[in-house]
Amino acid sequence: MHVRVLFFGRLKEIVGMAEDTVELSDGARVEDLFARYGAKFPELARFRSSVAAAVNQQYAGWSAPLNNNDEVAFLPPVSGGENPSAESATARDVCAIVRAPIHASEVANQVKAPADGAVVVFEGIVRNHSRGKATLYLVYEAYENMALAKMREICVEMRTLYQIDRILMLHRLGRLEIGETSILIAVSSAHRAAAFDASRFAIDTFKRIVPIWKQEYFRDGAVWADGEFPVAQPFPSQSESK
């Protein structure tokens, strides 16, 4: 069987490519595929405990079986076909990956409606320092199709947990200068508490499960800012929500 393989972030640098196509024996699993590359790239093998895998844009375990024409992505820790129900549940919401500058004052008005009593806007911006050094700029990359799917999943879960009206979620890719906006989340609701709580849930969950990575550039070089890996159950239960 043939499998398409994708690498991101630091893993892409280790193997020297972003994409590959390999032929595997029937019955092969994710761990077999990773071992194949690990044998060729010993540095990659040493990162096994820190690598996540996705099969056809869904997080998968090492023992997950592979099938012909599967797309397998090996992912460093995140900085961070679509479900039909998610599409219908988020028909009023906006989730997008963009490359142009994000201007909060221009896009936040999209979530306002006459029935709303509150709009909360979270804006993540590029700061001028990290790791005790001056930051020159950042570069973001993403597993785009999967990132959009996970963003929509977050919107669906937000509606399950909180009484909110509209959601807008944007993340920018490419080179960002100091002070520019990397992510914007806007939430409207009849009441402020729900809008605040939903916004906090959205950014915290986004940082854990959406496959987007940033590379920090300094005067003496660049590093990938790896965050935490997604967990098996990314969303809190109803009892844990406020």
Residue ranges and their predicted role:
Residues R4-L6, I14, E71-P77, N83-S182, ...:
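N-terminal, polar/charged subdomain of small-to-medium soluble alpha/beta proteins
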